[in-house]
């Protein structure tokens, strides 16, 4: 190579590090103001703090050699360099620290991209999932939002794809439920594939179909899409998905909730049976388990232990309430128990300015899309409380969200709200207000709360007790994280008491009533022992709030309802929604219902809660009991002066009445005393046993580690087991015939996916409770017959799976687009044409005419001569002897028309005299 020549390949390789750094930094600045539903976990927060410091990247030519080369240029890099660049470090993985990204055997370029992102240690879901995906296993991962599950499936997919395939066809598909989540996942894919020639695109609804046609013609390797638009493009473009190697269902529970089940089943049929399927979800509803059984091959269920356990730093309190006093209990808990401060005028003004500013930004975006957004305050980091009193309130339906939010705002609190069908922009705005401490309370439903994750919370309040113990764990698990303390308060009425007893069995923590604790203190005092302390971590302490305070809170609620008509209307709607919610809620166990009746019969279940100390109401009741035990019991009818004779008819009537009911009262008193003796006998036995036991053994025996090892197999050991080396070719090897009994035994094994999924399955009720009557028929005058009221006149076509899909999916727009651009149809599996790069310059245009009065006349003349040599005609420029003498019929016709026009215009009589 001469001195004047320039090596483009080496220059690009040297500059790759600096370019990628600038891209990362610019992308980071754009996202800082964006508040998204998915919030990183504690480990990711620590690593993200180091993102501000740019990592030092060596300028060795290890970047992908042909990253910026056009299709016509040759890749001069040696094959050994490329092999070394993409080599997975299996030898180094054995030397790497266990549990690190390097221990997974990832390639060098992927480890560099991970380091650029600032990630140092994998999260628990990544540590358990990535090795299984690398072993080509189908995985069902249960992980809440913010646990790092996006990287858990993106990293192994990128590692296994490595580089762009010259064959036409998509190799990896990632399906997301919403546009925002798809864009967020696509951003992660772009960052992790930086430095490779892997092509990735995103397909979401609302974007131009023509642009998406162009994107699909670039032969992408990774496709991130929403199911509706992807199915639309598949049908419209008649895509063949036989080249798909990996399919990922992200937030799969939300995919089914949002009505994508038909699209997913249609896509599942089109996929090849040899693909690897990955399914990630925060919960496992039954429909999702059925889908996993049908669409996945021998899947592995990955669950984190934290998903089914309550933090040992969590303290719980359960408050009993009457049917009409739930709102009063909520206000009392917020004001007196949590000590929630009321909003000041400055805080209200600041919140209004924020909301008005967001509305102004929306209007400005419609008028001037290029206008820079307003700078927002940065929310609290993931390991810090948004505010000292940050509280999340769970309600059953979206109607309750509107009602409770309005009630608390009228009471003077700063409140944000989120429910399932809330607009995405409003959802982000409400979440930002809570995380940036503009508000202290967030009112949500179970469906909406599963899509967000607030890393650190001070308190959780259950407006109603959920119908499932697993949903309760999912709720209260949002506080007391990362070693922080937290409180969970639940409001329970008599209908929800059986669910509390189910929760008692599920958690292994006994219910503690006020009367039980007082008897325990009395027994300890008689035996000379110190009074036991109330443990809100190990017991489910049940009781009511002080009666006087509840009455004052109820009076406040009545005043708010009396003075606010809209609040009364919303309350009525919420009450109707609550009726539907109770109707569709799964019932409690029969045994818990029986025990709940026994507890309510004792009358001790709604005594004042131990959290509030001595009960003043009880002293008043004791005084009234003394009056009831007085010897002379006279009614107002029997009151008379001394010496007066009993001649009054009313006095005689009361004496007769007393004689009649005396035996009934005596039997009732004896039965009550007998029940009290039986209860006390069992209670005394339980209390003495608990005193002799340790604090952590509340009525239950603990197994030691040896017993557990004999019964269960350790999941980490199963993961670390190495497969025996075999020389079988899986493509041709046929195993022995297994009889039906062997197959049945294998399906009935305790370690099967069905049993594990059944243990983790629970359904969340929809927060928008509307009664649907699908079989109501109505008379159609035009058709002259009864038709289903829910039916529509939409036209459908039959898809590959036999299901009906909208006929608008096949509108012919792709064929029109392809013909207008003279593009060849996609042939899946064929070699791609090298000249089909999207940004390659392919247009051949004639140069401009050279102008003698310009300085570049000679340069332009050379361009024209070169174009003429290439056969491109330049308008107005002809070489000597180049002008065509023979004319076409069209030229002759036009010439005749011009001649006739000139003749008609100029053929005037001559002025000369003849």
Swiss-Prot record:
One of its GO terms (cellular component) is nucleolus. Keywords: ATP-binding, Helicase, Hydrolase, Nucleotide-binding, Nucleus, Ribosome biogenesis, RNA-binding, rRNA processing. Residues 901-914 have a biased composition (Basic residues). One of its GO terms (biological process) is maturation of LSU-rRNA from tricistronic rRNA transcript (SSU-rRNA, 5.8S rRNA, LSU-rRNA). Residues 368-522 form the Helicase C-terminal domain. GO terms for molecular function: ATP binding; ATP hydrolysis activity; identical protein binding; RNA binding; RNA helicase activity. It comes from the Eukaryota. Its EC number is 3.6.4.13. Residues 130-302 form the Helicase ATP-binding domain. Belongs to the DEAD box helicase family. DDX54/DBP10 subfamily. ATP-binding RNA helicase involved in the biogenesis of 60S ribosomal subunits and is required for the normal formation of 25S and 5.8S rRNAs. This is ATP-dependent RNA helicase DBP10.
């Amino acid at each position: 190579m001469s001195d004047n020549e320039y090596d483009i390949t080496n220059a690009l390789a040297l500059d790759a590090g600096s370019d990628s750094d600038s891209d990362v930094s610019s992308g980071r600045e754009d996202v800082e103001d964006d508040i998204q539903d998915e919030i990183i976990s504690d480990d990711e927060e620590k690593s993200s703090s180091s993102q501000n410091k740019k990592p030092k990247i060596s300028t060795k030519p290890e970047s992908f050699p042909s990253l910026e080369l056009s299709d016509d240029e040759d890749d001069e890099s040696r094959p050994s360099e490329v092999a070394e660049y993409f080599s997975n470090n299996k030898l180094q993985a054995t030397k790497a620290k266990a549990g690190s990204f390097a221990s997974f055997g990832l390639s060098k370029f992927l480890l560099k991209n991970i380091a650029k992102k600032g990630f140092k240690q994998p999260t628990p879901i990544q540590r358990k999932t990535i090795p299984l995906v690398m072993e080509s296993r189908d995985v069902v991962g249960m992980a809440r939002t913010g646990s790092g599950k996006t990287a858990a499936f993106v990293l192994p997919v990128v590692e296994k794809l490595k580089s762009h395939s010259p064959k036409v066809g998509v190799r990896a598909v990632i399906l997301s439920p919403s546009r925002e989540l798809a864009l967020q996942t696509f951003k992660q894919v772009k960052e992790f594939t930086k430095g490779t020639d892997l092509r990735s695109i995103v397909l979401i609804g609302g974007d131009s179909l023509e642009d998406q046609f162009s994107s699909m013609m670039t032969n992408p390797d990774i496709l991130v899409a929403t199911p509706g638009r992807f199915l639309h493009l598949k049908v419209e473009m008649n895509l063949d998905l036989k080249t798909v190697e990996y399919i990922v269902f992200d937030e799969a529970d939300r995919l089914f909730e949002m009505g994508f089940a038909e699209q997913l089943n249609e896509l599942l049929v089109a996929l090849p049976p040899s693909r690897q399927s990955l399914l990630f979800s925060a919960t496992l509803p039954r429909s999702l388990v059925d889908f996993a059984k049908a669409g996945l091959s021998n899947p592995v269920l990955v669950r984190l232990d934290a998903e089914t356990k309550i933090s040992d730093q969590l303290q719980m309190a359960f408050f009993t309430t009457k049917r009409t006093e739930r709102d009063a209990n909520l206000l009392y808990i917020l004001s007196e128990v949590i000590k929630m401060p009321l909003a000041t005028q400055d805080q209200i003004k600041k919140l209004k300015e924020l909301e008005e500013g967001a509305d102004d930004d929306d209007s400005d975006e419609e008028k001037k899309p290029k206008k820079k957004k307003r700078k927002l305050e940065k929310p609290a980091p993931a390991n810090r409380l948004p505010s000292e009193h940050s509280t999340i309130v769970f309600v059953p339906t979206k109607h309750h969200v509107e009602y409770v939010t309005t009630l608390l705002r009228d009471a003077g609190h700063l409140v944000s709200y989120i429910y399932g069908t809330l607009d995405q922009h409003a959802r982000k705005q409400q979440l930002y207000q809570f995380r940036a401490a503009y508000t202290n309370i967030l009112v949500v439903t179970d469906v909406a709360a599963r899509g967000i994750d607030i890393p650190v919370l001070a308190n959780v309040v259950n407006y109603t007790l959920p119908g499932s113990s697993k949903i309760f764990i999912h709720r209260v698990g949002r506080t007391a994280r990362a070693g922080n303390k937290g409180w969970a308060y639940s409001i329970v009425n008599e209908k929800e008491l059986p669910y509390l007893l189910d929760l008692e069995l599920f958690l292994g923590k006994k219910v503690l009533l006020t009367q039980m604790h007082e008897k325990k203190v009395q027994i300890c005092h008689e035996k000379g022992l110190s009074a036991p302390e109330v443990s809100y971590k190990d017991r489910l302490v049940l009781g009511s709030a002080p009666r006087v305070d509840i009455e004052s809170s109820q009076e406040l609620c009545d005043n708010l309802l009396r003075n606010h008509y809209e609040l009364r209307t919303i309350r009525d709607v919420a009450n109707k929604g609550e009726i539907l919610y109770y109707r569709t809620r799964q019932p409690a166990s029969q045994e818990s219902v029986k025990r709940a009746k026994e507890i309510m019969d004792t009358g001790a279940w709604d005594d004042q809660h131990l959290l509030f100390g001595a009960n003043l109401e009880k002293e008043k009741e004791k005084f009234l009991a003394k009056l009831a035990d007085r010897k002379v019991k006279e009614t107002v009818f029997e009151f008379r002066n001394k010496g007066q004779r009993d001649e009054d008819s009313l006095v005689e009537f009361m004496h007769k009445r007393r004689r009649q009911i005396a035996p009934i009262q005596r039997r009732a008193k004896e039965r009550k005393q007998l029940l009290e003796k039986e209860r006390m006998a069992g209670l005394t036995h339980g209390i003495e046993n608990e005193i002799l036991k340790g604090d952590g053994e509340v009525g239950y025996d603990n197994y030691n580690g040896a017993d557990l090892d004999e019964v269960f197999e350790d999941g980490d050991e199963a993961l670390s087991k190495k497969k025996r080396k075999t020389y079988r070719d899986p493509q041709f090897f046929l195993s022995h015939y297994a009889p039906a009994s062997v197959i049945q035994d294998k399906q009935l094994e305790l370690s099967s996916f069905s049993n594990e999924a059944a243990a983790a399955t629970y359904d969340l009720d929809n927060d928008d409770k509307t009664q649907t009557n699908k079989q109501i028929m109505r008379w159609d005058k035009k058709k002259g017959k009864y038709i289903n009221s829910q039916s529509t006149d939409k036209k459908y076509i039959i898809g590959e799976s036999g299901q009906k899909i909208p006929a608008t999916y096949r509108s012919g727009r792709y064929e029109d687009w392809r013909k207008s651009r003279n593009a060849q149809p996609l042939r899946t599996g064929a070699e791609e044409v090298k000249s089909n790069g999207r940004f390659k310059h392919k247009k051949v245009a004639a140069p401009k005419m050279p102008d003698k009065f310009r300085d570049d006349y000679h340069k332009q003349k050379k361009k024209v001569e070169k174009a003429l040599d290439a056969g491109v005609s330049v308008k107005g420029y002809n070489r000597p002897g180049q002008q065509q003498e023979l004319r076409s019929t069209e030229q002759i016709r036009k010439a005749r028309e011009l001649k006739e026009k000139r003749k008609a215009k100029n053929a005037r009589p001559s002025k000369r005299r003849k």
